[in-house]
């Protein structure tokens, strides 16, 4: 599928924006980059003092997975094991942040 043919859903975009803002507020910092392709990315989690370029700790998930995790944070492990969460780096396990942010 060509990138040009993929369009953002406005309702999903608004929901993702609100969820990312909540995560950023709950876990301020710039040690982890959380990417939601087509919709946005934030840097969050205090820790390693990262200043330029891409952080060593990265998480990439779809908008649908982000919404699922906000509704049920306990899904982190199973979604990661099924490959729906791509995470790298020592600080990339955001399961606790989702659990605390979206109780």
Descriptions of predicted regions:
Residues 1-103:
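Feature captures hydrophobic
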